[in-house]
C-alpha cells in the first residue's frame, strides 16, 4: 500500500447535471455538496459559472463546507482572445471558489480541427489560463480532454 494521498474529485453537480431530466436547483446543489463533504470528497465540482443562472449564483456566494473544496469548472481561454477579453474565462475567474478546474484540449487532432490553432498556441493558452488562476490565489486543476486519444495519436504532445 502506498503512503501517497489519494484525492477524490466529484463531478456530480456539473457533469451529472448534463443528464436528461436532471436540473439541480441552487438548494439541491447545496444539499448534495454538504453530503459529499460529509462523505470525505476532497473536491466538489459544483458547476460552470457563467453557463447558467444557477451556477453563476452558486459561485457568487458559495456555501461553506467542512473539508471539501468547492470547485468551479470552465474552459481555458479561447483562441484569438486575451485572458481579459474572454467573457467565459472571466466568469470562471470571478467565481468565489478556492479551486478552479479548466478543461483543455490535449489531442492535437482537436486542437487543429476544433480550435483551428497550432499545438504551440494551444499549450500557451493553457499555460496562460492556469497561471491566471494561480495568480488569483486559487488552486488550479486541469482536465485534459481526450487525453488518452491524444496520447495514442501523438505521445510527444
Model feature map: region roles:
Residues 1-82:
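N-terminal capping/small domains of soluble enzymes
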Residues 61, 82, 86-101, 105-157:
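Hydrophobic, small-residue-rich alpha-helical packing segments that form membrane-like cores
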